[in-house]
């Protein structure tokens, strides 16, 4: 039976067999197990910092602790000790614990001091032009020169906006200080249509108007060609009363034509023909590498408009090329280093770095995006229309000081006070019909409709043209699918009233001033709050009233609410269209959709035909190259080959003559002249 013997731990059982308090031993075993379980639980819940002792001492301590545990008996309420035991003060908080009962305080982002405490520009509803007080007229502003006032009057500007009143005198005063005091770089965050272009154009023109020789002293960089053209026109009008020259660089013109307007060469030296250059990033890189004599060593102002977009890496890393060019041509620094700490360093660095001016309606509050520019003691100007009220302001524990802290305004996207925001809920399949019904219901005659892509703009334009066939409203497309020339023509027709509505992609949503837009429609939900701000910014510009309407589906509501919450904005007023629009316009809508499908098939076939044509042309060219080696020789090629053979034979005959004896060489043998050799060659060819 020894094969079936099972050896078990019987030490405690032996004590029970001996009859010495059998029941008490069972309680002791249970108590030991509970204590060990509680000890293991405490080790898992808290991290204790303990010095590592020597191994021998550790084993002895373990034995002593085990012997002590055997002596202590606590049979009553064994779990209460674990529950009432305090956690040591040197232990860390357990991650993942159940602290839902305690209210967690929201962590505030730590910003640099200049971002956390901006200079607030109080904005609001602008007064109509006829109600401008006499004290606010441009003639009464002592910091504006006479030629500036004359140019502004020609532009039909009677007063300055709040942004201009703050920024223009500050820049002029900063440059009035004597060396070595450098002007601080500035960032301006203001709503669209608030006059940011004149805010930097006026002080630059006034500060450069007394220049002696013509050099590039101001560089204005903008993201798109249309916006660059708009800024170029504004600066050109301001310079009309001065001798300053303005040059526009964009891919809408030939590079050679721009080079002629930019530099000229005289007696081996290059001279600049422009004082102010307005450009796009890509075109700037082209001229930095391709235009000889284009030098920026005298650069005094670097203006970056729409700074949040233009600082992205997608613009060919233009800042790197600009910095490299400046370092190669002069000892001037573009990016700069840390702020000088003494008078000698201030004096040595004075005039070696341009004054940087950044402008945007959605200026980023991320310091990393502005790090590449290395701004010199920057200052932020931010526009606030109304004092925002935080949602948690009325709850207990709310930070009341934060309500008056200027840092709360950083990153807030503001819209003009004259803007009315609305939305309309519809079905996805009825979206084009809803846009048509809204235009007809409210009799909008000047509107923009934005989509998320150029292809969507093309399709929507086709459908709306069919729906508006029987009406006086005319719509047209304005997207990246069109050339720059066609886009400019469409904008001119819209400004002249020949077109009532433009169906646009988001390429037009930034900075471009389209005259007298009454309504902006968002056909598709914008992907980000910045896109929405720039879309609605095409209306309610320069104190005029405007309306922004977003067409939504039930599925879009959640995303749109989240987008607006980022700007502390609400949904606005909901507007409706007739529920019978599908029945009323069923025939036209069906015809439009059928035409769209056929147009889509037609475009697809055209693309396939173009692709096949290109492939066939490439194949023919390849065959021509292969057969070029076996084609028969022409007469000229045969004559050339025969002439080469005669030349070779004449060389051989001359070599044989040189190998004659010395006696023969002493005899006089006149050499053949060049004419005789040519005559022989022609005679041989004739034979």
Curated annotation (Swiss-Prot):
Superkingdom of this protein's organism: Eukaryota
Binding, ATP: 190-197
Any one GO biological process: rRNA processing
Motif DEAD box per record, residues: 305-308
EC number: 3.6.4.13
UniProtKB keywords: ATP-binding, Helicase, Hydrolase, Nucleotide-binding, Nucleus, Ribosome biogenesis, RNA-binding, rRNA processing
Motif interval(s): Q motif: 160-168
Limits of the Helicase ATP-binding domain: 177-381
InterPro entries with a match to the protein in the record: DEAD/DEAH_box_helicase_dom, Helicase_ATP-bd, Helicase_C-like, P-loop_NTPase, RNA-helicase_DEAD-box_CS
SMART domains to which the protein is assigned, alphabetical: DEXDc, HELICc
Span of the signal peptide: none
Compartment(s): Nucleus, Nucleolus
Domain (Helicase C-terminal): residue spans on this chain: 434-583
First-tier enzyme category under EC: hydrolase
Keyword ATP-binding among record annotations: yes
Cellular component, GO, one term: nucleus
Catalytic activity: ATP + H2O = ADP + phosphate + H(+)
Tissues in which the UniProt entry reports expression: Expressed in the germline tissue of the ovary.
Stretches the record annotates as Disordered: 1-26, 52-87, 646-675
Any GO MF annotation of the entry: RNA helicase activity
Keyword Acetylation among record annotations: no
Protein task: ATP-binding RNA helicase involved in the biogenesis of 60S ribosomal subunits.
Family: Belongs to the DEAD box helicase family. DDX51/DBP6 subfamily.
PANTHER family: RNA HELICASE (PTHR24031)
Record remark on domains: The Q motif is unique to and characteristic of the DEAD box family of RNA helicases and controls ATP binding and hydrolysis.
Record protein name field: Probable ATP-dependent RNA helicase Dbp73D
Organism: Drosophila melanogaster
Gene: Dbp73D
